[in-house]
Swiss-Prot record:
Pathway: Carbohydrate biosynthesis; gluconeogenesis; Carbohydrate degradation; glycolysis; D-glyceraldehyde 3-phosphate and glycerone phosphate from D-glucose: step 2/4. It comes from the Bacteria. Its main location: cytoplasm. Keywords: Cytoplasm, Gluconeogenesis, Glycolysis, Isomerase. GO terms for biological process: gluconeogenesis; glucose 6-phosphate metabolic process; glycolytic process. This is Glucose-6-phosphate isomerase. Belongs to the GPI family. SUPFAM superfamilies: SIS domain (SSF53697). Its EC number is 5.3.1.9.
């Protein structure tokens, strides 16, 4: 099955040809927008979130056809298979059960196992938060350093920063991911080993970057006076390979388990989120899970026509596969969500950046768009120029938090006004005639530069307040969007073979950087020249 062979796909193409030149400005014109208004007709809600899809280049017929495509592609079947614990990651022969990590039904897959591990996490987190857990000199823990990369870093880091207003002031959480020593060294300058807990997170506990940083931090502890026998007070591990954690030197009782049926980029709900639980506490962590579970239930139970992940995913396909958009922007108007775009980059591009279909044939259509973003209003002063007047159409997801999580409440109307005004300006634009009036009769040559094409599509997601629950729902919304799109593209959203080749060659090149000249492997001329240049620099 390919998307092009779906019965509704050709109908959608015909529909696209019919409306592709229509301007949203005309759709919103009062004479064309009777009650119920376009805003009312394209407003949807689920999982505690609200979505305004009205400023997209869609009609009711568009949504009807997009939903038909989703249904014909088997979105419902694949969704149900995922929740049931069936194999939906066929290349690795695995179930995909991040939803089980937040399930409340005792009949859910691995329910008892998940609950037991979370209870262990909660006991430990409470000990650290209360000061009961002490370092080797008897001081309480005041610094937590999470060492991981990819899903072992991006999710926890995003959540801890987003919910900083809920975090205990007694503990500062740092995240180290890059194998560049500057990343770890910078954190070392800010912590005291006597008051530091390191959480080493790696599914295999063999990840190059993570283990390099873990060993360096362990050596630093010892250099600063921590006896090797006391390292158990300062190091814990999270892994699906407990034996390797113990081999590293972490005490068996300090090992928290994750499982191979949870992908890294979907793992913050597991023990991978231990740094989150220590920061915000077990009760708030449960709220995070509850919000995600609420979105899970919405995704599972709501009809496709009113299903937020389905609508968000299918509108993304509309722009990617029909309008030819190569990227889409995530613009959270919340500084607390600063790391959300980078988290979504991995979630979407590592999941759906694939060229091989499930049957092994190559796709002949675009898959994942480039995901990028920056919080508002910062982005307005960086790249919104291109969004408004550039020749490339970039769909945008605006995320607006309606009430602030901080005491500077007078700032918030300004923030929200900018968010809503940007969506309006991108939609309505400015015509040449309007631009001439702005330019004035004495500067007619300026008018073309003041034209805004408009008709730039945006979705606005509304969050009442940035709570652990609402954040959980927001994350789960995008998780399920990934499954929807991957199903329609007929690809495996849950493997990541694209990261493997670089790892393999990286080990060869690393050896070549320090090997005797006679042992350096043959590479292409470019790589060989780079290695030679680096070898010379490293000898200085």
């Amino acid at each position: 099955m390919t998307q092009n062979s779906l019965p509704s796909w050709s109908s959608l193409q015909t529909h696209y040809d019919k409306i592709r030149d229509a301007h949203m400005r005309d759709w919103f014109a009062p004479e064309n927008d009777p009650a119920p208004t376009r805003a009312e007709r394209f407003a949807f809600a689920g999982g505690g979130l609200a979505a305004d899809f009205s400023k997209n280049r869609i009609t009711e017929e568009t949504l009807k056809l997009l939903v038909q495509v989703a249904r014909e592609a088997g979105v419902e079947k694949r969704r149900d298979a995922m929740f049931a614990g069936d194999i939906v990651n066929p290349t690795e022969g695995r179930a995909v059960l991040h939803t089980a990590l937040r399930a409340t039904d005792p009949k859910a897959p691995f329910y008892a196992q998940v609950q037991a591990e979370r209870k262990k996490m909660a006991v430990f987190a409470d000990q650290v938060r209360s000061g009961e857990w002490k370092g080797y000199t008897g001081k309480r823990i005041r610094y937590v350093v999470n060492i991981g990369i990819g899903g072992s870093d991006l999710g926890p880091k995003m959540v801890v920063h987003a919910l900083h207003h809920l975090a205990t002031p007694e503990i500062t959480t740092h995240f180290v991911s890059n194998v560049d020593g500057a990343d770890l060294y910078n954190v070392m300058q800010q912590i005291d080993p006597e008051e530091t807990l390191a959480i080493i997170v790696s599914k295999t506990f063999t990840t190059l970057e993570t283990m390099t940083n873990a060993r360096s931090l362990r050596d630093w502890f010892i250099e600063k006076g921590c006896p090797e026998s006391a390292l158990a007070k300062h190091f814990v591990g999270v892994s699906a390979n407990p034996a390797e954690v113990v081999k590293f030197g972490i005490a068996k009782e300090n090992v928290f388990e994750m499982w191979d049926w949870v992908g890294g980029r979907y793992s913050l709900w597991s023990a991978v989120g231990l740094s989150i639980m220590i920061a915000i506490g077990p009760k708030q962590f449960d709220e995070l899970l509850a919000g995600a579970n609420e979105m899970d239930q919405h995704f599972r139970d709501a009809p496709l026509e009113k299903n937020l992940p389905v609508l968000l995913g299918m509108i993304g396909i509309w722009y990617r596969n029909f309008f030819g958009s190569q990227s889409y922007l995530v613009a959270p108007y919340s500084q607390a969500l600063h790391f959300l775009p980078s988290y979504l980059q991995q979630l979407e591009m590592e999941s759906n950046g694939k060229s091989a279909r499930l049957d092994g044939a190559m796709v002949d259509y675009p898959t994942a768009a480039v995901t990028w973003g920056e919080p508002g209003t910062n982005g307005q002063h960086a790249f919104f120029q291109m969004l408004h007047q550039g020749p490339t159409i970039v769909p945008i997801d605006f995320i607006a938090v309606l009430t602030p999580e901080h005491p500077l409440v007078s700032h918030h109307p300004k923030l929200l006004a900018n968010c809503f005004a940007q969506s309006e300006a991108l939609m309505v634009g400015r015509t040449l005639e309007e631009a001439k009036k702005v330019a004035g009769a004495d500067k007619p040559e300026l008018a073309p530069h003041l034209v805004f094409p408009g008709n730039r599509p945006t979705t606005t997601l509304l969050v009442d307040a940035l709570t652990a629950r609402s954040l959980g729902a927001l994350i789960a919304l995008y998780e399920h969007k990934v499954l929807v799109q991957g199903t329609v593209w007929n690809i495996n959203s849950f493997d990541q073979w694209g990261v493997e080749l670089g790892k393999i060659l990286g080990k060869v090149v690393e050896a070549d950087l320090t090997a005797p000249s006679a042992d350096v492997k043959k590479h292409d001329s470019s790589t060989s020249a780079l290695i030679a240049r680096a070898r010379a620099a490293l000898k200085k």
